[in-house]
């Protein structure tokens, strides 16, 4: 069975947007009257009109996403219950660069699955972090992978490790603050075994360990964004890998050619995967934890 999506939401959205533009045409038209030969004013009015039209389209998207989520909130995404008969090899890739979190990784490693390994892909330059990573690896029998440079940053870090590696079937991407549930692997594999065209499975997330006012207030955006936007995108249109808390099949990774060395490598990888015939699915029943940035400066750096 293949996972299928519908473009119905976007057809309705564009149609509603065009109606809004048609109703506003008279107002736009009158704004250009009296411009005369003032070309600078004309150009500014054109730019202003285009910006307004774009923001209306973006606003329509927000309205329709919320509406379709509300409309279908009782229609839970079909969660696979297929049994896994074989024992595919899964590797956890913990990516870190001067932000190692031993507690998060230790919790993520407590998987109710036998055939998996954990690798720390360490791009750290800070000696204290390197020392901490080495101590954790020794205590927990985890392999640490380092490289001479930081070409490609996170994407390059993952590609450097997976280049030429064949002894695995799936890999899971973990950020430094990521905590995945104990049944992450077993639940994720059911999606791949149920839908043959899935190449990427993006898990659900909540914000946890909020220790200050900034985190408690703004983390609500995380808790509302994941179930609303991702469940809608799962059924309508295009869903992207969001960089962490996700499982990727080896076949998808190999056929796509790895992660591109760009800023939004997760989005670009998802597009390349779609072009190769793979799709990205959302797993609402696999709930991972992430930490919200501690302040505005950390938030700005994060985005």
Predicted regions mapped to residue ranges:
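N-terminal membrane-anchoring/stem segments of glycan-assembly enzymes
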Residues: 1-84
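Short, acidic, metal-binding catalytic loop of nucleotide-sugar glycosyltransferases
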Residues: 106-115
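A conserved acidic beta->alpha catalytic loop
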Residues: 114, 122-132, 148-151
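Long helical/loop segments within the catalytic core of UDP-sugar-dependent glycosyltransferases
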Residues: 135-138, 145-170, 182-263, 296, ...
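Catalytic donor-sugar/metal-binding loop of nucleotide-sugar-dependent glycosyltransferases
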Residues: 261, 270-288
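Active-site donor/metal-binding and catalytic loop motifs
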Residues: 284-299
